[in-house]
Each structure stands twice: as C-alpha cells, then as structure tokens.
A protein has these predicted regions:
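Intein/HINT protein-splicing elements and their conserved insertion hotspots or analogous self-processing inserts
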Residues: 1, 60-195, 202-210, 254-261, ...
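Conserved phosphate/anionic-ligand binding catalytic regions in large, soluble enzymes, centered on
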Residues: 5-22, 178, 226-235, 314, ...
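Short acidic loop-to-helix transition motifs that present clustered carboxylates
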Residues: 15, 33-41, 84-87, 282-285, ...
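Glycine-rich anion/phosphate-binding loops
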Residues: 179, 208-224, 568-572
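N-terminal beta1-alpha1 cap of cysteine-dependent amidohydrolase-like domains
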Residues: 428-591, 595-600
Length: 600
C-alpha cells in the first residue's frame, strides 16, 4: 500500500469512471484493458460494467515492483493509463484517439440541473411515543418482544459464518447462553502479525421517525449509530460515516423535499458532532405503482477501538447497579447534541475505568427491549422500576448500563439492579417474568422461517452387517507424529486460488509453536503453474505438517468443492512428495475445501 497513491473500484461506469475519476489529466489505452470476450468497440470498452477490479495510481518508477508484487499473489495486473499534466481525459483504442474531454467540462457534469423542493409539514404529535398493544404489562412486554423490529433473527443470522478470518471480537449473540444480541460488529484488523486494534461498526435508522420527518429520521440515524458504538466501549469522537439513501421516485416538489430534508438533518449532526461522512449507495427509484418506500437515510458509522476495552451487552454480575444514561430531546424533538456528547464521553470514561461492564443502546423496543435482551445472555435475575408510559417509547441516544459502582452524574438515573437468585427472573415494576419464557417469545416469530435448531436425524435403516445392538467400533487412526523429534516443527500451508482462511490458520499454527511456511499457487500462466508445483514440492519435502486450508474456487461447481486442489495433489511430483511425507511420519490436515480435496 505504500506504493499506491490513489485507488478506485470498478462498478457500473466501467473504465470511464473507475479510471476517469482518479486525476485531472489521463491518457487511457482501451485496447490494453483485459476483457472476457473479444469484439468490443471503444464505447463498450469505456463504459461496460466490470466488477472485482481495482484501479490504482503509482509512480512510474514503482511499476516493475508493483507488477512483481501482484504476480507473486496471483493477481492479474495491467498498465492501462498514464497520468498527464494536460488537464484532459483522453482515450485511445490502438492508434486512434477516441475521446478527448477537458476536465473542466467533465467536472461541470454537463448541463446544470435544477429541482424545486417543498419540505412538507410534519404531524403535530410526539413521534417518540409508541403504543404497544396489550391489556397488562405482561401482554405489552410479550408483544414488544414480537415486534418485527425487535424479535430475534438468530436463525437467519446463524446461516452466516461470523468467525471467518479469525478477527471477530464480539460474536453476534453474547453471554453464557449466547442469546443477547450484539449491537455492533467488532473485528480485529487483518494483519499477518498480532494486533489489539479493532474496528467497531454500527448502523442507525428508524422508518417510522423518518416517515414522520425525514429531517429528524436522518438526525436520529446518526445518533443511534453513535450510541451503539459508545455502548460497546468505543469513543464516538473519531467516527466516520457512510450514508445509504433510498427514496421514492422524484416526481414533484414534495417528493424532492424528502431527500433534501434528510440530507439537511444528517448534515446538522455532522457539523454538531464533528463527524464527517462519505456518500454511499443511493437510489431514487423506490416506487412501485402506488407504493413508496419510506424516506431512508441509514447511517453506518465506524471507528477504531482497543479490543481489550470492548464490552458486550449481556448482564455480568449479581449486585451490580442498572443506570439509564438518559437523553432528553429538545422541544422540537431534535437531538440535544451537547447533552449527548457529555453522556457519551461519561460512559466512555466509565468503561475505561472498568466501572461499566455492559451497556445497551436503546432502539426500536425502548427500555423494555434493552433490559429483556441484556438479561437473556447469562439468565441473571434483574429488577427495574420505571414509568410504564415510557417503557416502550423510542429513546434514541439513551443507553442502559450495568455499573459496579455508584454513578454520580446528572443524567444517570438508577432504575434497578442485577439481583441475587437462581430463578432467572426479570422483575419490571414488581411484575415477575421468567427469562426463558421471554426468550421463547422473542425468538418465536421467525422460528418457522429461520429455525435456530435442527431436529436430530435418525436413520431407520441398519447398515449391512450390523445387528443394531452391538455398537459399531471404527478402527481408531493413530494421529501421533512418528518422525524424528524436532525442536520446532514446520507447517506448510499452500495458498490456492480462492483460499480464504490461510492467515487465521497460520496464526493458529504459530500459537501452537510451529514454524509456518506459506506459498501462493499461481496459475495465470503455464510458467506460473510449473514454478508453483516445483515450489510446493520443495516445501512439502521440507515440512513436517502439510495443511490444506479452506476457501472457495471458481471451478468448484458443479459436482462439489475442492476439484482444483485435488488436481494439484494428483500431479505426480506433488503426489510423490506427499507419500514421502507420510512415509517419514509426517502429518496432513485439511479443513473445508482442503479436506474435500483430500477425500477426492
């Protein structure tokens, strides 16, 4: 990355955008651009969408070094443009000049566009008051936990691997029971060595507030994202944002008023918090016949944190106090940014002092959702007392914290404690709730669509030769190393196209005390393949352990995974080296794609 001065990703605009945006003066050579098929004319080469590509700017003197780095990682690299001082974007196809535009003209975006916007009046009501159906407190708590925006999506979430890359600091669900939802994504930075620096990312958006007022909706989207980050133990002060916008089709002044007011609301938060944003994906096509999407400006915020300072949201210890660090909106329902900054800084200080051990940023389900979900993870008894009229209201910016000490702060309201007891009971205003019943209610709505359990599979067919009474005893393999003793075993990890857990596997081996050797199997040219096979054979000959890591390769389907790796293993030189490894008592380990290749 020290060689790269600037970069851009390829997308819908193809070469014209990905390269054209990089600098003022450019000479672009369209005939050099790699294509999937021949016969494209100049226009098609210039504007065709192309994914999975990056454009980078380097100094001319670094060209050979850059190409060498790319080739060593099996990455295709092509010199397709030169930076000039002409202030013009020129495109050539062979010897022909096909485009010659001044940067001044490009930056003007062509003809100027104007649109008239009218910001509509909002309804005269408090948008934070939320009515939850139910005759009793129990009914309301149950209905709140089954709200589509509050109910558990654990079955859906567990369809995705949250551990790949070996960087996850907070799992999606925390606690001994793994049932308290985590509000942020915390990932250690990917590096070949070791680090405690992690990224922490959160989002914010409420379609009901945004429908009432896009201005307020955008402002509270930023507030919600910041609150979640603070509740995880990070500081909001260096957060950076990307806003994702989605609005109805723009047809009149009133429709134009919605993105205008949303952007103004977000901009106000940027200025008052001092937190910049870049634009994200945006669309003005959210209309189908007479159905419109709600005005959407979703805020995604990210910052860095020391992984050791991160706290998870589940309740931790009996006897701890529960405080609501309360945010009180201004008279016009906008966030009180000065109060929020003070609150967030106070919480961050208490987390760093190890006084606050868990926290939950209030969201769709209000305080009732927060205390229920915090109690799920460890099943600890807790008791709170709070005004039932405000229990379910939106309270964005407010954070419920578990503290080991008494908090002396004007906006810290003591509402309860984590109590002694083994009944797993949550008491709200004197009404007792069984925590496991609350969990069942919270997970029930989507359970049939996205189940979080699987029924055991029992085959009624007894395999031939077994009477179903005597247990089948498989011959146990002897997995001990039988070679000569070594002080530091060498583990060799070949990296094939598509391998994606090589870094995490290497760290695991180093932690276990092995010397790790890795080599990338390059296959861009025939010469690359021969060289990679020779290098792989040499490494197998010198290692004590061969590990085939997991991943994905484009040749996997149809007929299953691991075919590319299996073909390499069947090469005579590689096969002979593997047999020699086994003969000298060496060990082989395969995981995921690597294991499937061994089976094949």
């Amino acid at each position: 990355t020290r060689l790269i001065k600037k970069s851009n990703d390829f997308g819908a605009g193809g070469v014209s955008v990905a390269i054209g945006e990089l600098t003022d003066g450019l000479d672009i050579y369209l005939d050099r651009v790699p294509v999937k098929y021949n016969g494209l004319n100049s226009t098609e080469l210039a504007i065709s969408e192309s994914q999975e590509r990056m454009s980078v700017v380097i100094e001319a003197k670094d060209k050979d070094a850059m190409i060498a780095y790319c080739r060593s990682e099996n990455v295709e690299v092509t010199h397709v443009a030169d930076v000039t001082d002409r202030g013009r974007m020129r495109m050539f196809n062979g010897d022909r000049l096909v485009v010659d535009l001044s940067r001044e003209f490009i930056d003007s975006a062509g003809a100027k566009h104007y649109a008239k916007a009218t910001v509509g009046a909002v309804e005269d009501r408090n948008p934070f008051v939320r009515e939850v159906e139910g005759e009793t407190l129990k009914d309301k708590v149950f209905n709140n936990l089954q709200d589509p925006n509050v109910t558990s999506q654990k079955g859906l979430i567990e369809m995705f691997d949250s551990t790949i890359g070996r960087s996850t600091v907070l799992m999606p669900f925390g606690g001994m029971l793994q049932t308290t939802e985590t509000q942020v994504s915390v990932q250690k930075l990917p590096t070949d060595g070791y680090t405690d620096t992690a990224s922490v990312m959160a989002f914010g958006y409420n379609p009901y507030i945004a429908s009432w007022s896009p201005y307020h909706g955008a402002a509270y989207a930023v507030v919600e994202a910041c609150s979640k980050v603070v509740a995880a133990g990070a500081s909001y002060e260096k957060m950076r944002f990307s806003y994702q916008e989605y609005f109805e089709r723009m047809t009149d002044r009133k429709s134009w008023g919605k993105p205008l007011s949303a952007l103004l609301g977000a901009l106000k938060m940027q200025v008052e918090f001092g937190l910049p944003s870049i634009g994200g994906k945006d669309s003005m096509s959210g209309t189908f016949e007479n159905i419109n999407v709600p005005p959407m400006l979703m805020a995604f915020g990210i910052t860095t944190v020391d992984a050791g300072q991160v706290i998870s949201p589940e309740l931790k210890y009996e006897g701890n106090r529960l405080y609501l660090i309360k945010h009180t909106p201004l008279a016009d329902h906008m966030p009180d940014t000065e109060q929020l900054k003070a609150n967030w800084n106070f919480i961050h200080e208490q987390v760093q002092a190890e006084n606050v051990v868990s926290a939950y940023a209030l969201g769709f389900g209000g305080l009732a959702e927060a205390i229920c979900k915090m109690s799920f993870g460890n099943g600890l008894d807790a008791k709170i007392t709070y005004d039932e009229k405000e229990l379910f209201n939106y309270a964005y910016g407010s954070i419920l914290v578990e503290s080991e000490v008494e908090l002396d702060y004007p906006n810290a309201i003591l509402i309860g404690e984590v109590t002694d007891g083994e009944e797993s009971e949550l008491t709200i205003n004197g009404k007792k709730f069984d925590i496991f019943e609350l969990m069942a209610v919270n997970s029930g709505r989507f359970a049939q669509v996205y189940p979080d359990t699987a029924e055991a599979y029992n085959s009624k067919t007894v395999p031939a030769g077994l009477d179903g009474v005597k247990p089948f005893k498989a011959k146990k393999a002897d997995l001990r190393y039988k070679g000569e003793p070594v002080e530091k075993p060498i583990a060799y990890l070949p990296v094939f196209p598509g391998t994606n857990c090589d870094y995490d596997s290497a760290k695991a081996w180093r932690n276990a005390g092995a010397e790790v050797r890795m080599s990338v199997f390059c296959n861009l040219t025939e010469e690359d393949i021969f060289r990679s096979i020779a290098e792989m054979k040499k490494n197998i000959d010198e290692c004590h352990i061969l590990m085939l890591c997991g991943g994905f390769s484009a040749g996997d389907e149809p007929d299953g995974s691991g075919k590319f790796i299996a073909n390499v293993l069947n090469n005579k030189d590689i096969a002979d080296a593997i047999h020699a490894l086994i003969d000298r008592g060496g060990l082989i380990l395969g995981i995921c794609n690597g294991f499937q290749a061994l089976v094949k």
